[in-house]
Amino acid sequence: MPSDVGFPGNEAGTRCWRVRRADDGGVVAGVEPLGWDPAAVAADEVVIRVEAAGFNYKDALAATGHPGVMRVSPLVPGIDAAGRVVGGGGLASGTAVVVTGNGLGETRDGGFAGFVRVPAAAVIPRPATLSTEAAMACGTAGLTALIACDRLAMLVDGRHARPDEEWLVTGASGGVGMMAVAVLAAAGHRVVACSRKVSAVVTVTSLGAAAVVRPDEIIDPTPKSLVKGRWAGVVDTVGGPLLADVLRAVRPGGAVAAIGMAGGADLLTSVHPFILRGVTLAGIDAAAIPTQAERAALWDRLADLWPRVAAAFPVTRLALDDVGGWAQRMLAGETMGRGIVIPE
């Protein structure tokens, strides 16, 4: 890497959104100069000029100092980033790339900055048909939705699910939920989208939902460990009490892909759905995609999917100065679709 004269990260005006734990146990966060040390860039790292970064629920947690996500201090959040290679890793300067996971925004500085440095093995060439902002509108949310729907297809379709069976997506107004609605509908399933936001009805219907319901409309007040089976497959982005209730209503041989915890991290349930109906509860972790080839294949699928959903998919462009406010709104359940940070 070059000396610090003109070095990416030390350029005048290069900024980031950084969070740190204060001595009194509080959290201090905001926009500040990125200020890299050139010696800190390892030989196997790639430096990327960030053009856009996806805003995920994990980023909202990191931005507010949640210890389960913010593993180091100080930290630049942003588990997704897209931009162009500046140097390193044997990649040509100017190559359009995307990167997700690999500790970004958790154990190492992430994409809410003008530049990011990442392990070369984490970098994926951006599909030519997917713009930088479209890539981040998809991001980890899109990858997670694809993995979840693939897992459900293996578990549920293998038992010859009927075409008229209903598939549920909870938290359908969020990025993962909306993507899951689109993926399941494209596979020919009858999708029921669950959201407490009235404003989401038109959007998720446009993405392929056959029906839109509120959480209270699918919760059965009966204090039983099992209720009438309704769902063949479920993509759950909420967790907590809603996931526990949904499990009781999964049909025999059905499955639930668990993704999020916006509704709570605790799961109070019984073993009855699993041992009496053969229900599978599968955890989904998009950060655990093992190889570059598998990640690249998923990105190619997102590039094919995006043109079919772009017109209906809500995307909000955010400046670095907007990060704190958007994080608070996301944690309060007040956002819809995807936010993308443009760190220019």
Residue ranges and their predicted role:
Residues 99-167:
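NAD(P)H dinucleotide-binding glycine-rich loop of Rossmann-like/cofactor-binding domains
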Residues 107, 241-308, 342-344:
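Glycine-rich phosphate-binding loop and adjacent beta-alpha segment
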Residues 136-215:
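Mid-domain Rossmann-like dinucleotide-binding core that forms the NAD(H)/NADP(H) cofactor-binding site
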Residues 2-7, 15-51, 72-76:
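A short N-terminal beta-strand-loop micro-motif at the entrance of redox/enzyme domains
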Residues 218-229:
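Short amphipathic alpha-helix with an adjacent loop that forms part of the alpha/beta core around
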Residues 38-55, 66-104:
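Glycine-rich beta-strand-centered segment in the early N-terminal region that forms part
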Residues 4-5, 9-12, 293-344:
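C-terminal hydrophobic helical "lid"/dimerization subdomain
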Residues 98, 232-235, 257:
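N-terminal Rossmann-like NAD(P) cofactor-binding module of classical short-chain dehydrogenase/reductase
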